[in-house]
Amino acid sequence: MKGIVLAGGLGSRLSPLTKVASKQLLPVYDKPLVYYPLSTLMLANIREILVIAAPNQIERFSDLLGNGEELGLCISYKVQMKPAGIAESLILAEEFLDGSKSALILGDNLFHGSGLGRRLEAFNEIEGAQTFGYHVQDPSPYGVATVNDDNMVTALVEKPKYSESKIAIPGLYFFDETASCRAKELKPSKRGELEILDLLRSYLDDLLLNLEMLPRGTAWFDSGTFDDLHEAGTYVKLMQERTGERVGDPLEIAKIRGWVN
């Protein structure tokens, strides 16, 4: 299992800050945002990781993370010339994956919860695709899943104006080794992008898509706006003060797992 952090995008809702820095490099309390998705992959026991970023930002990520050696990781980098959809990341990562299963996480998503790492680690031997669900009040900003009484996915809709389902799909996905080939077969959407929901539908059509609700007590933040960044930062500060434990700290995770001294 290898990991992909998609740290591209224009971050237009965070302008003017994103005119000088990728949003994934902006601070969430005491750490850059990208530390949090990187930590999630590490909690899933994934140590080979590809960071995908825009041409004018890739060097900054490399300056921050290096080759991963200090974290017990092997980190490499790939340029995404322009935002062309989340699913394109599986195409860009094809050489890196080299037939491996993969975990894809969006660089602006923060996950935190007791036992989350152990749960995610269970998907390292996945057959098909694994996505997750999170109950939200307003699903309109997200990809949304409809499930039946057996918790099987019956429909996937991108940013619906109205939806009876309140199950948002967070930016974390596990795929088998066919993901890159499936992504290359997708056609661009009306907005000219290779959509992640279309990739998930490819698995759904083959009865190979599974959805699991994130464990009770898990927090998820999609940090795309100033309010989102503030809310996520407030959460991190509160949790660290309450528990005395660091949230989203790659070095601490590496030490706990014995990857570094």
Where are these regions (language model features)?
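Short, conserved catalytic or adaptor-binding loops enriched in Gly and charged residues
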Residues: G66-G72, V147, S202-L204
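Catalytic-core segments of class I nucleotidyltransferases/pyrophosphorylases
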Residues: A103, L120-E121, M152-A254
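Short aromatic/basic micro-patch
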Residues: P27, Y173-F174, W259
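Conserved N-terminal catalytic core of the sugar/cofactor nucleotidyltransferase
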Residues: K2-V5, R13-P16, L26-P27, K31-L106, ...
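Conserved donor-nucleotide/metal-binding helix-loop-beta segment in metal-dependent transferases, i.e.
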Residues: G113-P141
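A short acidic, often aromatic-flanked loop/helix-cap motif at beta-alpha or helix-coil junctions
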Residues: P83-I86, D138-P139, Y162, A219-W220
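A structural signal for short hydrophobic beta-strand segments in well-ordered beta-sheet cores
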Residues: L25, A145-V147
